[in-house]
């Protein structure tokens, strides 16, 4: 048997497998935006951008279909369990972050379930993001911006910080409201 031919054949097969793997991994990222006007949904086939404009009575691209049939989030917002979330790339103090969310018809995120906290922290990664949890200066109780009481634990709360971030440490962390961080806005999906 000619071992040189067998080894050459195996090398060609390995190169083809590696090449096909890279092709399958990166082809959708490079050529994923098609001009056919359809965005795949999670389990209901496709929803056309034209149908989205019919729902809202306008023909712009400021809203895009999400992965849940019949719901729409603004462009650059993420859909999760009936809500739309915006993760900022810029940083601002807490008040400016809250004001930005208000201009978008939303609020800072109210993270009132462990599942929602995990989802937001997974996306936040190593960055810290303001959420809608604060306490009035001099008070001990933390409240969500919808005025509901928070019953969990906040780290660093003894440092006289009155706002909260999530992200890097996977906990609720007290933070100065005057320091600039990224922020998460939340609204109901339409």
Swiss-Prot record:
GO terms for molecular function: carbohydrate binding; virus receptor activity. Strong expression in bone marrow cells and thioglycollate-induced neutrophils (at protein level). Expressed on granulocytes and monocytes from bone marrow and peripheral blood. Expressed in macrophage cell line J-774, but not in T-cell lines, B-cell lines, or mast cell lines. It holds the Pfam family Lectin_C. GO terms for biological process: innate immune response; myeloid cell differentiation; negative regulation of apoptotic process; negative regulation of myeloid cell apoptotic process; osteoblast development; positive regulation of cytokine production. Residues 26-190 are extracellular. Its main location: membrane. N-glycosylated. Contains sialic acid residues. Residues 80-186 form the C-type lectin domain. Keywords: Cell membrane, Disulfide bond, Glycoprotein, Immunity, Innate immunity, Lectin, Membrane, Signal-anchor, Transmembrane, Transmembrane helix. PROSITE patterns: C_TYPE_LECTIN_2 (PS50041). Induction: By TNF in bone-marrow derived macrophage colony-stimulating factor-dependent macrophages. Up-regulated during the differentiation of myeloid cell line 32Dcl3 into neutrophils. Residues 1-4 are cytoplasmic. Glycans are attached at residues 51, 146, 153. InterPro entries: C-type_lectin-like (IPR001304), C-type_lectin-like/link_sf (IPR016186), CLEC5A (IPR052869), CTDL_fold (IPR016187), NKR-like_CTLD (IPR033992). It is found in: Cell membrane. It is linked to Involved in the pathogenetic mechanisms of Japanese encephalitis virus (JEV) infection of the brain. JEV infection of young mice results in increased expression of CLEC5A in spleen and brain with consequent activation of proinflammatory cytokine secretion. Acts as a key regulator of synovial injury and bone erosion during autoimmune joint inflammation when its activation leads to enhanced recruitment of inflammatory macrophages and neutrophils to the joints. Monomer. Homodimer. The majority of CLEC5A is expressed as a monomeric form on macrophages. Interacts with TYROBP/DAP12. The interaction with TYROBP is required for CLEC5 cell surface expression. Interacts with HCST/DAP10. Forms a CLEC5A/TYROBP/HCST trimolecular complex depending almost solely on TYROBP. PANTHER family: C-TYPE LECTIN DOMAIN FAMILY 5 MEMBER A. Functions as a positive regulator of osteoclastogenesis. Cell surface receptor that signals via TYROBP. Regulates inflammatory responses. This is C-type lectin domain family 5 member A. It comes from Mus musculus.
């Amino acid at each position: 048997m000619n071992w040189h031919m067998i080894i050459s054949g195996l090398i060609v097969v390995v190169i083809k497998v590696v090449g096909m793997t890279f092709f399958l991994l990166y082809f959708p990222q490079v050529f994923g935006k098609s001009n056919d006007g359809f965005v795949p949904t999670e389990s209901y086939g496709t929803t056309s951008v034209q149908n989205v404009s019919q729902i809202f009575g306008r023909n712009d691209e400021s809203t895009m279909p999400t992965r849940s049939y019949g719901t729409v989030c603004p462009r650059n917002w993420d859909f999760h369990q009936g809500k739309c979330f915006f993760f900022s790339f810029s940083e601002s103090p807490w008040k400016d972050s809250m004001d930005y969310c208000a201009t978008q018809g939303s609020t800072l995120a109210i993270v009132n379930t462990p599942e929602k906290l995990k989802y937001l922290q997974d996306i936040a990664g190593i960055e810290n993001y303001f959420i809608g949890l604060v306490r009035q200066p001099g008070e001990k109780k933390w409240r969500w911006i919808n005025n509901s009481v928070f019953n969990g634990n906040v780290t660093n709360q003894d440092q006289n910080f009155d706002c909260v971030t999530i992200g890097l440490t996977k906990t609720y962390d007290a933070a100065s409201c005057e320091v600039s961080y990224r922020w998460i806005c939340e609204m109901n999906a339409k």
